[in-house]
Amino acid sequence: MDYFTLFGLPASYTLSLEQLAVRYQDLQRQYHPDKFASAPAAEQLAAVQHSATINQAWQTLRHPLTRAEYLLSLHGFDLASEQHTVRDTAFLMEQLELREELDEIGQAKDEARLEAFIKRVKALFDTRHQLMVEQLQNETWDAAADTVRKLRFLDKLRSSAEELEEKLLDF
């Protein structure tokens, strides 16, 4: 059973996080291992396994990139374990330049420049994210998979920039 079916939701990128959370809590109450403490060992084991599946499904579906990766996996794209890389040299050069810029900002400890950088990366991410949403809705799986790969780069860059921001604010 796929995670969307487990939560009683359509297999779609766009979903209600509130509905997902409510369904998660319902399933957790229903299958929590403590409810099976006096049950036979086989039922206890099944409850633990089902609870673990529910938790994994929750973690996967509540985060935008992992939800997109999972949806793509249902259509034959195993992005989590693949060795396929981004082949767009212009994009890769842009990433390299952005990484270098982030390093320079870190060395200069320039908070104002970092704030502008974070906004710029967020805008790049948001633009690609919107493209990915459209590609998933249109079921252009190859293009969506490529966009998800690029979003991973931007997500890591954003995380690095936010870590630098925390580091600079601690000083």
Curated annotation (Swiss-Prot):
Keywords: Chaperone. The gene is hscB. Co-chaperone involved in the maturation of iron-sulfur cluster-containing proteins. Seems to help targeting proteins to be folded toward HscA. NCBIfam families: hscB, PRK05014.1. Belongs to the HscB family. GO terms for cellular component: iron-sulfur cluster transfer complex. One of its GO terms (molecular function) is ATPase activator activity. GO terms for biological process: [2Fe-2S] cluster assembly; protein complex oligomerization; protein folding. The keyword Chaperone applies. Pfam families: DnaJ (PF00226), HSCB_C (PF07743). Residues 2-74 form the J domain. Coiled coil: none annotated. This is Co-chaperone protein HscB. Interacts with HscA and stimulates its ATPase activity. Interacts with IscU. It comes from the Bacteria.
